[in-house]
């Protein structure tokens, strides 16, 4: 197959949702339809031995939430689909944000009983920054749901995106009979397929077919016809250009748990979602059709293999083709490296990649030299932009139970900070280690990973820090004066960047007024 054909058949997407809207179940069912796993293990919390394929870290297994981002690749409809699983738990916005910089489209999953929830709103704001095309799946139709028209109205008014229903539900809860495909004029009748059973779906042609009345009952058939008249009068028709621009979302209805409707949005994804898209660098735009290799690292994950203390850098291939043993330039450090053992992923199962094309995600073994945001090319000096680091909102001091393990603690924290799991600050005035996070759960993750991966018993406690800002100044003399007078509020982060840590917001505001020449940054590029 030629290079353009390989690139054009790739679809790279992520699933975004509020916690518990069914994202992990959908992830599994997508893999099931892509024949990537044989049995979809229902995700359980503590104590269950059936863990979802994409939740592999110890703490995730205990809590039944996907904390880290995994990558899964599977074939579907002559396409090769890369699914990036993002953490659904409300605490993990940074990792999720960075993952969304590596995809070309997203599937938004909504719990049809609850509608649009707060976490979905946040994630949609992120996709808005790059106008990412969005498909929508209204999930849990095997339960009692809100009125479907109401759900569409809510998506339109709250998320500011037009909805184009592709399928429409017939009943819900115990009376759920299936969905009607508006463009194809076909009804797909629901039969629950549990676990890994994909039922043969019976299809009824035509909305006026008496077979439809016989299958779902006169009342529901008539209700469907009435609702569709309303829908066709009130909602938008699918418009591909508006979808690609992130202005309109095709909407599908179904139940992931019942293995129903998942294939409908997969058909939509492979047919309509964009092929690998261009990406901005500091010098030019890189198109996916270019045959020279380039890619950027959007995530680093430690210990994917419990047997080895390894770290894997996840790289999105932007252009060209990766081949085993090829020489690439690691732009930030200006070194050429030979990559002979890149990985491809089926979550938890890693296999060595012989080749990968634009749109694919590959894993590079990392012994501490690769950082989030790093660019790799075949020689060209450029840096992909738009992968941010956020100033944390929550802070804790980390304390050792055994003071002799200070060295291991520091090593563990620096590695976790390079991975983007947490940010570490070392105050200039004392030996404290302060960690900053975007969500509370991250502190638990850090303590649990320090224990399992670095054999360090640590606890965290409150610390008098309200917020942090990275500080820079063009005038060296003024910067020195600022540093001298504010030493008690200054710290170095994991990458040795100078940071102002403020005990209160008032303190920060005063410092900014007092030193107008100093730049205080809330985010910085990786």
From Swiss-Prot:
One GO term (biological process): regulation of translational termination
Location(s), subcellular: Cytoplasm
Location (main, coarse): cytoplasm
PROSITE patterns found in the cross-reference section: G_TR_1, G_TR_2
Domain of life assignment: Bacteria
Keywords, sorted A to Z: Cytoplasm, GTP-binding, Nucleotide-binding, Protein biosynthesis
Gene3D superfamilies: P-loop containing nucleotide triphosphate hydrolases, Peptide chain release factor 3, domain III
Function according to Swiss-Prot or TrEMBL: Increases the formation of ribosomal termination complexes and stimulates activities of RF-1 and RF-2. It binds guanine nucleotides and has strong preference for UGA stop codons. It may interact directly with the ribosome. The stimulation of RF-1 and RF-2 is significantly reduced by GTP and GDP, but not by GMP.
Family, similarity comment: Belongs to the TRAFAC class translation factor GTPase superfamily. Classic translation factor GTPase family. PrfC subfamily.
Organism (species): Actinobacillus pleuropneumoniae serotype 7 (strain AP76)
GO cellular component: cytosol
Gene Ontology MF: a single term: GTP binding
Protein name per Swiss-Prot or TrEMBL: Peptide chain release factor 3
Residues binding GTP: 17-24, 85-89, 139-142
Domain tr-type G: from-to ranges: 8-277
InterPro entries linked: EF-G-like_DII, EFG_III/V, G_TR_CS, P-loop_NTPase, PrfC, RF3_C, RF3_dom_3_sf, RF3_GTP-bd
């Amino acid at each position: 197959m030629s290079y353009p054909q390989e690139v054009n058949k790739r679809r790279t997407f992520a699933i975004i949702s509020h916690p518990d809207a069914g994202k992990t179940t959908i992830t599994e069912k997508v893999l099931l339809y892509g024949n990537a796993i044989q049995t979809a293990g229902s995700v359980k919390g503590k104590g269950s031995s059936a863990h979802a394929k994409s939740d592999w870290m110890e703490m995730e297994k205990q809590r039944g939430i996907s904390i880290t981002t995994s990558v899964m690749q599977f074939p579907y409809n002559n396409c090769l689909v890369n699914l990036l699983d993002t953490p659904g738990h409300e605490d993990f916005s940074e990792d999720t944000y960075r993952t969304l910089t590596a995809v070309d489209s997203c599937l938004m999953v909504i719990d049809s009983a609850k509608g649009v929830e707060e976490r979905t709103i946040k994630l949609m704001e992120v996709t808005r920054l790059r106008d990412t095309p969005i498909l929508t799946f209204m999930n849990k139709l095997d339960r009692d749901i809100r009125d479907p028209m109401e759900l569409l109205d809510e998506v339109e008014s709250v998320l500011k995106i037009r909805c184009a229903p592709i399928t429409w539900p017939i009943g819900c809860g115990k009376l759920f009979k299936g969905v009607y495909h508006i463009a194809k004029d076909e009804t797909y009748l629901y039969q629950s397929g549990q676990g890994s059973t994909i039922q043969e779906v019976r299809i009824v042609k035509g909305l006026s077919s008496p077979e439809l009345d016989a299958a779902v009952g006169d009342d529901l058939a008539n209700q469907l016809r009435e609702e569709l008249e309303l829908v066709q009068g009130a909602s938008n028709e699918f418009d591909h250009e508006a979808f690609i621009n992130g202005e309109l979302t095709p909407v599908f209805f179904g139940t992931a748990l019942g293995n129903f409707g998942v294939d409908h949005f997969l058909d939509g994804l492979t047919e309509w979602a964009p092929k690998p898209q261009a990406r901005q660098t500091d010098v030019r735009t890189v198109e996916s059709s270019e045959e020279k290799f380039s890619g950027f690292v959007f995530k680093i994950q430690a210990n994917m293999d419990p047997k080895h203390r390894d770290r894997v850098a996840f790289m999105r291939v932007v252009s060209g083709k990766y081949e085993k043993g090829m020489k690439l330039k690691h732009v930030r450090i200006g070194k050429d490296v030979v990559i002979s053992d890149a990985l491809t992923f089926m979550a938890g199962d890693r296999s060595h990649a012989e080749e990968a094309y634009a749109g694919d995600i590959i894993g590079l073994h990392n012994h501490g030299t690769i950082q989030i945001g790093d660019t790799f090319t075949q020689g060209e000096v450029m840096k992909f932009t738009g992968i941010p680091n956020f100033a944390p909102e929550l802070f804790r001091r980390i304390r050792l139970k055994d003071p002799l393990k200070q060295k291991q603690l520091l090593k563990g924290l620096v590695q976790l900070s390079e991975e983007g799991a947490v940010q570490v600050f070392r105050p200039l005035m004392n030996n404290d280690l302060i960690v900053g996070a975007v969500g509370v759960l991250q502190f638990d993750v850090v303590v649990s990973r320090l224990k399992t991966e670095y054999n360090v018993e640590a606890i965290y406690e409150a610390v008098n820090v309200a917020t942090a800002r990275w500080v820079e100044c063009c005038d060296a003399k003024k910067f020195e004066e600022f540093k001298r007078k504010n030493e008690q509020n200054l710290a170095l982060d994991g990458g040795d960047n100078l940071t102002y840590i403020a005990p209160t917001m008032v303190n920060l505001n005063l410092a900014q007024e007092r030193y107008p020449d100093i730049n205080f940054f809330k985010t910085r590029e990786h």
